[in-house]
Amino acid sequence: MILFITLPLLNVIISGLLSRYIGVNNIKRLNIINLFIILILLIYYYINIIKTDNEYTLKIIEWINIEYLNINYSFNLDLLSITMLIPIILISLIVNIFAWEYMKDDSHNPRFYTYLALFTLFMIILVLGDNYLILFLGWEYIGIASFLLIGFWYNNIDNIKSSLNALFINKIGDIFFIIALIYLIYIYKSLNYSLIFSLVSYINIDINNIIILCLVIAASAKSAQFGLHNWLIWAMAGPTPVSVLLHAATLVIAGIYLLMRSSPILENCPNILLFNLWLGAITSLISGLIAINSNDIKRIIALSTMSQLGIMFISIGLSSYNLTLYHVLCHSLYKALLFICAGTIIHSLNNELQDIRFMGGLLIYMPITYICMLIGSLSLMGLPSLTGYYSKDIIIESSIGIFTISGLIIYWLVVLSSLLTNIYILKLIYYSFINIPQLNKYIYNSLSLNNTYSLPFNFKFNFDKSWMAIICMIILSIGSLFIGYLLQDIYLGQGNSINGLFIYPNNLNLIETHFAINIYYKWIPIFNIFISILLIIYLYEFNYKLLYIYNNPLFYNFYILFNTRFLFDQILNNYIIRYTLYLSKSLNSLLDKGFLYTLGPNGLNYLLNLLSFNIIKFNTHLFNHYLIYISFSLLLFIYLQFDL
């Protein structure tokens, strides 16, 4: 188990300090080999934990021991943490393979691989930590690593702005996380999971509400929920491997993991569960409305991530943490697949174009990418028998299974969100691969020269040139096809308990979802898929003029509202970030460079000079003055010595 920490740490040290001596390619090989070793060990532990229902604990040192507060630097491996680790390590491995070719022409590869290794290391620490302090340590460092990765190409001002945006919004969540830690220390006198969770039912519900609300806000910032979601959209400024790493299965699920790990506290706070339910539904719907009016290929996929994160919040609000964990695992596979396909397209177009309206006709030149993109998209849509169907549809159905008015409204909101998801992901495929070619003819000539291979008898065929990307896409495509079916009994099977999760028996609604709800509610998400396919074919092939409805003043205003992302960027930049930066500058000038500087360095320097100048005045070179000084000193010594 110690290898889960030491091997990524070795990657960080060697990539950061020794790359100039052993070469960049050797750094890449070492990172891939170490991650592959960790993945093999994880699969071994995963099978063992499923068979025996064991947990593994590793205590390294005693970290803090102050009066009643005792915190160890220790790690715990249970079914919750290992299920989170598998997509983290798998996607990190895929990203390292994909980046080998994608970033081969970049002159700062050692720095890039150092950041990747740093991010992976602290994601592992976050998930394996045995207390909230270690979780917070990993939480902070993945925020720093994501800031460095998003702003990796720092010569572009947009990248710097995007990385700062991500940093500022995540710091809002970090502040609330710190408040929650202070409350936990004050109320529970500990930060250890086992002690807190054993006492939670004896603590006043209002106090628990405050603690878990702070944790929910922290999770909302990290997992891009409505109101704190802006950074996710702008994080696309980084290299595509960074987008895969951050938005598929790592950074954005840190908040989801925090809430799943805190499930014993959440279960004692029904009002916060209801808040999570509505927050997830609104996030899912808002992301769909924004994405359907977006045309950037990476931004559309990022918004689909935001939508799926909203669905995960819904499942948390339903107390269906096993469904949340299952969806995290399944979603990471097809979302990473979509991002890698998008990166392959952008890379093939010489990194010059991300607007899908100016693509088209790529099916002929990139058939493997098209097939893999189609698999990932259909899995995202929830086509029966694919991975996304098994994890996504059961969450949508579970909102009906609680048999409340809120559940019914949430169900229809998520159904509408799913319809929007289906439409914009099909729109992406149509514009990129099927539409009439819109690119410059020289780009198509370049694609034809690079992607055409000859066979005997003058037979030629087109094939994707990027072999590294093809390997990654095939691996993820297999996962997107079969993992959902293969693992459903582990997470959805009756009687299976997941170590690390706690659900009140009254909140178990999976049986009602399976057997009590009307069959029509189960079929509606599937009908959504066929409705969206027919709608896309009708609009883009037979009645394109219908899209001119945007020229209508009413619809145009809605289009502007959705296209400007509900003006959240303007509100955030003009009224929050700008005034926050102004306040920090004022406080820096008033306190740090003003009051404290005057009392500190300047004040101390002035006081010492004044004191030394006055002491010099006693040096009169007169014997009687020296005799008085000696006599006074002797009397003072006698007084202090004998306590007169």
From Swiss-Prot:
Gene Ontology, cellular component aspect: mitochondrial inner membrane
Location in or out of the cell: Mitochondrion inner membrane
EC code(s) of this entry: 7.1.1.2
Entry keyword annotation includes Flavoprotein: no
Tagged with keyword Nucleotide-binding: no
Catalysed reactions listed for this entry: a ubiquinone + NADH + 5 H(+)(in) = a ubiquinol + NAD(+) + 4 H(+)(out)
Major subcellular location class: mitochondrion
Domain of life: Eukaryota
GO terms for biological process, alphabetical: ATP synthesis coupled electron transport; electron transport coupled proton transport
Membrane association type: Multi-pass membrane protein
Family: Belongs to the complex I subunit 5 family.
Record-given protein name: NADH-ubiquinone oxidoreductase chain 5
Gene responsible for this protein: ND5
